[in-house]
């Protein structure tokens, strides 16, 4: 059951994730994207070791960080915009963690929007990726046209 708009609190935790990035995760992602870029397919990256495609970790974590919360507490919605800031390479074998939060809610031209954000860090707390996404919140009785 969606939380009423007036009761949505800025700062609410939307989810958390902790994962260790493996070569297998990178390989599966590259295969799905039909990519063999040498920075990601081997150890030829400027970082000196195998790195993950920049958007891999946010995609792996999307459900735990945002989607479960949105489906449970927000209800029908459409992604309105999304932006990543890639701050440091994510390397194979790296342990990564993030906490998702509701950081903004607003109304524009009679429509309601929420913004969610997660900062991915390594075990030492080094910022790796900032994922920020805005969702258009649809009315609870919204139905897809047949």
Label every PLM stretch briefly.
Residues 1-81, 142-146:
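Hot-dog-fold acyl-thioester-processing enzymes
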Residues 1-5, 86-146:
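HotDog/MaoC-like acyl-thioester-processing domains
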């Amino acid at each position: 059951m969606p939380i009423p708009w007036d009761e949505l609190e800025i700062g609410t935790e939307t989810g958390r994730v902790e994962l260790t990035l493996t070569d297998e995760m990178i390989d599966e992602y590259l295969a799905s994207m039909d990519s063999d870029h040498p920075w990601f397919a081997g150890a030829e990256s400027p970082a000196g070791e195998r790195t993950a495609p920049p958007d891999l970790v946010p995609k792996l974590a999307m459900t735990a960080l945002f989607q479960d919360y949105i489906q449970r507490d927000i209800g029908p919605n459409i992604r309105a915009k999304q932006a990543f800031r890639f701050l440091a390479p994510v390397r194979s074998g790296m342990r990564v963690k993030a906490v998702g939060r509701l950081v903004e809610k607003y109304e524009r031209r009679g429509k309601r929007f929420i913004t969610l954000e997660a900062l991915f860090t390594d075990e030492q707390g080094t910022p790796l990726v900032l994922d920020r996404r805005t969702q258009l919140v649809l009315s609870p009785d919204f139905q897809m046209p047949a």
